[in-house]
Amino acid sequence: MGNTVIEKIIRHNTGKDVKPGDIVTVNVDRVMIHDIFIPFVGDKFEEMGFTKLWDPDKVVLIYDHLVPASQVDDTRHFHKGDEFAKKYGMKNVHRSDGICHQLMTEAGYVKPGDVVFGTDSHTTTYGCVGAFPPGIGYTEMASILGTGTMWIKVPETIKVVIEGELPKNVMSKDIILRLIGDLGADGATYRALEFSGSTVENMTVASRMTIANMAIEAGAKCALFTPDEKTAEYCEIELNDYQKSLKGDEDAKYLRTITYRAEDFVPVMACPSQVDKIRDTSVLEGTPIDQVFIGSCTNGRLEDLQAAAEVLKGKKVADYVKLIVTPASRKIYLQASKMGILDTLAEAGAMITHPGCGLCCGRAGGILSDGERVVATNNRNFLGRMGTSKVEIYLASPKTAAACAVAGKIVTPEV
């Protein structure tokens, strides 16, 4: 019998033939720790009795949730992180370069077929290049830092096939939101999602990142895309035989297969306050809004900003509506600036902020108060995430979000 992509990655890593449900120990290729968890990881690492990192070059520390500090306690996280990095010889430290999940792929830390762990649930993002990237807690991370290994249970795989050409006003965000709605918030718990089909093949790596990023919102352990020439170009590598083999075999055993026609997708939103509460944008039209946020590790990439700029070009943000745009990384910020994208956004009335997690995690300027309503491109709309527990958060694509900013209410984008 053939293998799924996740089975091939684990088999290559461990040297063992594996099947779903097997518990194995994997060798870790890279880890990521962000500023929220570094104090706890560091304390637990030393509490466990470790005196050195298994491989300092394979450890990446990224400050993104708390930069620049907006609360006094935030600086403690930076001090603890810097102390830990200096003490244990870590060189891969990013203090103001952008969001962890953007930087891990953008800076070349993750390659196709790698096994990567991160202290964040959206570590699943790296599946966009064909890596296996589970999110873990700080205790597990401390153990990896000392040993370079971690146990996992081999997940079952749900195959998602998408064929055809997407409508012009639909983005990959609409695809993953629809899938989450169909599966439910726990419909893929501890399972791998494996994406294929002509629509997927034609996607940019950035679009695949959006889908992989939000896979956890259906409970998935990972979302995997077969490495191709786009992947190789993005990662600035030539794919080796192992990486080229990372596609599901025809006779592989899948838990189930879900098939979509690309032409059937329409702009959708996740309604307050559940990510799997999906509605067509058309049935929500006319709902007044107070703010729009375009950014995050889900939709803060160059193509996202460009899509928003195309909608906003020559237009103005509606009166009494605030538009906040946060690029996912410094590199994206500079690219968007050179291309005139930031000018277009600013001329339309957008407030453009420094790269980072920003409003998505409610730690930067732009939080909302009771009764306010925001359309946002991030990945979660839980109660209290972007302000008080009485804020309504609607999740949407950058095109939809930009169109709503101009209209001052929920609308369906035309292009």
PLM features: residue spans?
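Fe-S-dependent hydro-lyases/dehydratases of central metabolism
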Residues: M1-V415
